[in-house]
Regions:
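N-terminal cationic and glycine-rich segments that engage phosphates or anionic surfaces
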Residues: 16-131, 136-140, 145-154, 224
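Generic alpha-helical secondary structure signal
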Residues: 9-11, 48, 200
Length: 259
């Protein structure tokens, strides 16, 4: 693959035709979501279809339940959600998708992990490689940056006057969360990936809503780029996130790249 490496995590046969590690401001995250809503519909539909391979009833499929709730949070139409489920359960004809991850560096040595879900690995590999090359980065070998991250469930909740810090802490910890970090804008709940769906459900049932929630690569080592590198990093993230094959982009950048 001309020096570009990726590792395959799982393949899916779909019947039918997604870092939050650095949140930035709540306003910045909301603005990013709004500007990419159409692309998010496509990405979330893929995620729902993949999750539905393990069963089309969200009551008994925690992964599907979470995927549906995330789609509803961005106002994805119910028809789109239903169609995506049917593609996963085999009620509609389908295509094959494969889940890939790429590791590499952006401008200034910022570490990137890019999660993909694609029906054409050559197309996606070429796109990711060229995107990094054009914006001052490079794709590396598996493991070249993943050692700087830990995989965790992350649930971001906006701080409001109606939310009591003790209540949310109690609800999260009782559901199995590992840690809760708060600041003037938000609460961030961290979980082991294995209990993420349970914590997500418990907090949803308790009436909390999420700005974002997912299983993330959370950086344990930060990278602070120069001012000259920040525009290149932001452009690279924009280019990657605008592509339907890219489900999630994780970085260890200490600077908010969504402002």
């Amino acid at each position: 693959l001309n020096g570009v490496y990726y590792y395959r995590r799982k393949s899916y046969k779909l019947e039918g035709g997604v870092s939050m590690g650095r949140h930035g401001t709540i306003a910045g995250r909301k603005a990013a979501q709004d500007s990419k809503r159409a692309a998010l519909f496509t990405k979330y539909a893929k995620a729902i279809t993949v999750a539905a391979k393990d069963g089309g009833d969200p009551e008994y499929n925690a992964g599907l339940r979470v995927a549906i709730e995330k789609a509803k949070a961005i106002s994805m139409p119910n028809d789109n959600i239903t169609r995506a489920i049917k593609k996963g359960t085999g009620e509609l004809e389908g295509v094959s998708y494969e889940e890939l991850s790429f590791e590499g560096y952006g401008a200034g040595g910022v570490a990137f992990i890019v999660d993909c879900l694609t029906d054409n690995t050559n197309r996606t590999t070429s796109f990711v490689k060229s995107s990094f090359d054009k914006h001052g980065g490079n794709v590396g070998t598996p493991g070249c940056v993943s050692y700087m991250f830990s995989r965790k469930g992350v649930l971001l909740i906006e701080r409001t006057d109606e939310i009591n810090e003790d209540d949310i802490m109690e609800a999260a910890l009782e559901a199995g969360a590992d840690d809760i970090v708060s600041d003037e804008e938000s609460f961030t709940v961290y979980t082991d990936p294995s209990v993420y769906p349970d914590v997500h459900k418990a907090l949803t049932d308790a009436g909390y809503t999420f700005i974002e929630s997912d299983v993330e690569f959370v950086p344990s080592v930060d990278s602070t780029p120069s001012e000259n590198d920040i525009p290149k990093l932001r452009k690279l993230i924009d280019v990657l996130e605008d592509n339907d094959d890219i489900q999630k982009v994780h970085t260890n950048c200490a600077i908010d790249l969504y402002e």
